[in-house]
Amino acid sequence: MKVNDRVTVKTDGGPRRPGVVLAVEEFSEGTMYLVSLEDYPLGIWFFNESGHQDGIFVEKAEQD
């Protein structure tokens, strides 16, 4: 995923939330995504762990 991609994020106890990627930072353990959400328009960071499906919080949104 890259900047300006439309994504959904997994949050505690609720449905996936739509957002837009503002920044991407790569690390050896995974990737950090700064995602703009309705409640957080300036963005909030989410981490996707490499190699752990349970550690994936940001996914690319399906195209309509």
UniProtKB/Swiss-Prot annotation:
Q: What protein name is recorded for this chain?
A: Protein DsrB
Alphabetized InterPro entries for the sequence: Dextransucrase_DSRB
**Pfam families linked:** DSRB
Similarity comment? Belongs to the DsrB family.
Organism, by scientific name, is Salmonella typhimurium (strain LT2 / SGSC1412 / ATCC 700720)
